[in-house]
Curated annotation (Swiss-Prot):
It holds the Pfam family SPRY. Belongs to the TRIM/RBCC family. Keywords: Coiled coil, Cytoplasmic vesicle, Immunity, Innate immunity, Membrane, Metal-binding, Mitochondrion, Mitochondrion outer membrane, Nucleus, Ubl conjugation, Zinc, Zinc-finger. Residues 76-109, 135-156 form a coiled coil. Interacts with MAVS. Interacts with WRNIP1 and PPP6C; these interactions positively regulate the RIGI signaling pathway. Interacts with CGAS; this interaction stabilizes CGAS and promotes type I interferon production. Interacts with USP14; this interaction mediates the cleavage of 'Lys-48'-linked ubiquitination of CGAS. Interacts with TBK1. Interacts with SPI1. Interacts with KDM4D and USP14. (Microbial infection) Interacts with hepatitis B virus HBX; this interaction inhibits formation of the HBX-DDB1 complex, thus inhibiting viral replication. This is Tripartite motif-containing protein 14. SUPFAM superfamilies: B-box zinc-binding domain, Concanavalin A-like lectins/glucanases. A zinc finger (B box-type) spans 19-61.
Length: 442
């Protein structure tokens, strides 16, 4: 080996024998000083010429051994790197395992809190529904009692009159009988005409039962689909949305009420020309607003929006329940439909003046086939089944509910805002192009 290290001297035969350590199996008296690259074995010098390895590529065995040593060292290096990779993989998998366990526990804790919140909301809803029934029952019973008391008073009057008439009929003195009859005649004539029959109007709680029946059916309809399928649909839907930040969130559904129930609170609010932008035009009945080419001339009202194509209704609601509809078929690529306080800023195009971008307003927005719910700058993505043509807006002022429905889509629920309203609410619109109308409701 020392001779091989010099690199310039050809190894001697004895060194080759010592290096190889064994003789040729075919020519046993000769040293196996060569290495057959094809057969991968050591041979003597005669084998490539006369033996079984005739014509095979060969080289010095010691040189092949040095090359093999280098290959072995390279293999050891690669094995060490690969072993470290597997060790790193195990570490990452163990870290991911711990994170997954922690995430699973935190998710279950979150779910427990949400279901507790849901139960509390259901309990509160049940209490409110029962309170509604009790309140209306007491009001109706009070009316019934007043009607019954009135009937009893009439009975007492008629009983008294009956006694007096009987006494008159039994009076033996003709003069006294005539005088008594004459004094009572007018009252007798008044009481002899038959009174009206009283038929108490029964109080029905079917609308309440129908509403909560629809709620239960909507929940049951959703839960009939296996949970894994619902979650998969939700994940796929949200992953297709680049703006989504919470893939896997469950979809909120709300029951769709019958339109006939909402029409009990129907309103047809008219629009206020003093609030609309100068580029907007109002129809004669003040129910349709459209974009114009030029601004209107004349004095500028102080209530007018001077930068945004917005308009408020003349009518406002500060108590009770109200329902109106908005037709957006001709509104083009973009529109905003909602409600706002009169304190909404009218000057400039800042967030304080934009519908839905402040605490004074709530709205649904459509632009470029995307739908959003906006309030105070916070937005929620909406995914209606079809493009919206007409919206229904329901306001329950005391309950703090402002809900939106797809009228042409079977009154499917779009979004509900919940708030404690502090000022009267005005229906509000904003246009991008085209026209928006408020239909007359029956």
């Amino acid at each position: 080996m020392a001779g091989a290290a010099t690199g310039s001297r050809t190894p001697g035969r004895s060194e080759l024998v010592e290096g190889c350590g064994w003789r040729c199996p075919e020519h046993g008296d000769r040293v196996a000083e060569l290495f057959c690259r094809r057969c991968r074995r050591c041979v003597c010098a005669l084998c490539p010429v006369l033996g079984a390895h005739r014509g095979h590529p060969v080289g010095l065995a010691l040189e092949a051994a040095v090359h093999v040593q280098k290959l072995s060292q390279e293999c050891l290096k690669q094995l060490a790197i690969k072993k470290q990779q597997h060790i790193d993989n195990i570490t990452q998998i163990e870290d991911a395992t711990e994170k997954l366990k922690a995430n699973a526990e935190s998710s279950k804790t979150w779910l427990k809190g949400k279901f507790t919140e849901l139960r509390l909301l259901l309990d509160e809803e049940e209490a409110l529904a029962k309170k509604f029934i009790d309140k209306n029952t007491q009001l109706t019973l009070q009316v019934y009692r007043e009607q019954a008391d009135s009937c009893r008073e009439q009975l007492d009057i008629m009983n008294d009159l009956s006694n007096r008439v009987w006494s008159i009929s039994q009076e033996p003195d003709p003069v006294q009988r005539l005088q008594a009859y004459t004094a009572t005649e007018q009252e007798m004539q008044q009481q002899m005409s038959l009174g009206e029959l009283c038929h108490p109007v029964p109080l029905s709680f079917e609308p309440v039962k129908s509403f909560f029946k629809g709620l239960v059916e909507a929940v049951e309809s959703t839960l009939q689909t296996p949970l894994d399928i619902r979650l998969k649909e939700s994940i796929n839907c949200q992953l297709s949305d680049p703006s989504s930040t919470k893939p896997g969130t469950l979809l909120k559904t709300s029951p769709s009420p019958e339109r006939s129930l909402l029409l009990k609170y129907a309103r047809t609010p008219t629009l206020d020309p003093d609030t609309m932008h100068a580029r907007l035009r109002l129809s004669a009945d003040r129910l349709t607003v459209r974009c114009g080419l030029l601004g209107s001339l004349g004095p500028v009202p102080v209530l007018r929006f001077d930068a945004l194509w917005q308009v408020l209704a003349r009518d406002c609601f500060a108590t009770g329940r109200h329902y109106w509809e908005v037709d957006v078929q001709e509104a083009g690529a973009g529109w905003w439909v909602g409600a706002a306080y009169a304190s909404l800023r009218r000057r400039g195009a800042s967030a304080a003046a934009r519908l839905g971008c402040n605490r004074q307003s709530w709205c649904l927005k459509r632009y470029d086939l995307e739908y959003w719910a906006f309030h105070d700058g916070q937005r929620s993505r909406l995914r209606p089944r079809d493009d919206l043509d007409r919206l229904g807006v329901f306001l329950d002022y005391e309950a703090g509910v402002l809900a939106f429905y797809d009228v042409t889509g079977g009154m499917s629920h779009l979004h509900t805002f919940r708030a404690t309203f502090q000022e009267p609410l005005y229906p509000a619109l904003r246009l991008w192009e085209g026209a928006i109308s408020i239909p007359r409701l029956p």
